């Protein structure tokens, strides 16, 4: 569910809304799968569906989504620093679901020491 909310936050970022088919396309899933997950996010109070198939994040959805993007950025930068590459996306995607807030904040502080703020 976090991957969907993270992507919704990215997609809604510029215009404030997105659509299920764009979400499905970006996550490389079927629109029906994305629609089911959006239903779950709606039940959690993170997303609201509007007329014409528009999806918008609720204030709570925005808050959680922004944290997920932050966590992703911190972890990705830390892995890139450790491995000296920019291709750590797969590892980031795997690890980010198991890392707690305290660890994220500690990694962010460590990155600041190296003058590498999270993106």
Regions found by a protein language model. Give the residues of each.
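C-terminal regulatory/oligomerization modules of transcriptional regulators
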Residues: 90-119
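A short, conserved structural fragment
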Residues: 42-50
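Append "Primarily bacterial transcriptional regulators
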Residues: 23-25, 41, 88
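N-terminal helix-turn-helix DNA-binding core of bacterial DNA-binding proteins
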Residues: 1-29
């Amino acid at each position: 569910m976090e991957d969907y909310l993270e992507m919704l936050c990215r997609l809604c970022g510029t215009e404030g809304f997105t659509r299920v088919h764009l979400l499905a396309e970006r996550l490389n899933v079927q629109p029906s799968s994305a629609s089911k997950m959006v239903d779950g996010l709606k039940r959690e109070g993170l997303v609201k569906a509007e007329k014409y198939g528009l999806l918008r994040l609720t204030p709570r959805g925005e808050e959680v989504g922004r944290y997920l993007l932050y966590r992703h950025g911190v972890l990705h930068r830390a892995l890139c620093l450790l491995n000296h590459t920019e291709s750590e996306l797969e590892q980031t995607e795997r690890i980010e679901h198991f890392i707690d807030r305290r660890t994220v904040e500690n990694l962010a502080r460590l990155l600041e020491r190296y003058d590498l703020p999270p993106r």
